[in-house]
């Protein structure tokens, strides 16, 4: 998997912003990416040291609009903890 395919976008919620002061950042990642690939990609792109990576797989949810049934897509989320003294400048300005 290529480096540009692993990280999709940051998760910008109130709960994810609360983790920024503890050097914890949340990103949506490719469903096929494993923890080693996520860690390597994050360190290469942002030039910081990663302490740990936790991943969560979310299943597709069924949604209904009247008699029509559809699905919201499944996705994978990674919670990335940086090592002590490391800071991610890109998201700290938000």
Curated annotation (Swiss-Prot):
Entry's Gene Ontology BP terms: translation
- Signal sequence coordinates: none
Supply the SUPFAM superfamilies for this chain.
Ribosomal proteins S24e, L23 and L15e (SSF54189)
Task: Write down the InterPro entries for this protein, in alphabetical order.
Answer: Nucleotide-bd_a/b_plait_sf, Ribosomal_uL23-like, Ribosomal_uL23/eL15/eS24_sf, Ribosomal_uL23_CS
Keywords carried by this UniProt record: Ribonucleoprotein, Ribosomal protein, RNA-binding, rRNA-binding
Q: Which GO terms describe its cellular component?
A: ribonucleoprotein complex; ribosome
Which Pfam families does the entry mention? Ribosomal_L23
Name the domain of life: Bacteria
Q: Which GO terms describe its molecular function?
A: rRNA binding; structural constituent of ribosome
**Quaternary structure annotation from Swiss-Prot or TrEMBL:** Part of the 50S ribosomal subunit. Contacts protein L29, and trigger factor when it is bound to the ribosome.
Query: What is the role of the protein in this entry?
Result: One of the early assembly proteins it binds 23S rRNA. One of the proteins that surrounds the polypeptide exit tunnel on the outside of the ribosome. Forms the main docking site for trigger factor binding to the ribosome.
Q: Which family does it belong to?
A: Belongs to the universal ribosomal protein uL23 family.
Q: What is this protein called?
A: Large ribosomal subunit protein uL23
Q: Which organism is it from?
A: Mycoplasma mycoides subsp. mycoides SC (strain CCUG 32753 / NCTC 10114 / PG1)
What gene makes this protein? rplW
């Amino acid at each position: 998997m290529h480096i540009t395919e692993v990280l999709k976008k940051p998760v910008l919620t109130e709960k994810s912003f609360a983790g920024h002061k503890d050097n914890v950042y949340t990103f949506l990642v490719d469903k096929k990416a494993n923890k080693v690939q996520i860690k390597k990609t994050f360190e290469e792109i942002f030039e910081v040291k990663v302490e740990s990576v936790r991943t969560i797989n979310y299943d597709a949810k069924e949604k209904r609009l009247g008699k029509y049934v559809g699905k919201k897509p499944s996705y994978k989320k990674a919670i990335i903890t940086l090592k002590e003294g490391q800071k991610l400048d890109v998201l700290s300005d938000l």
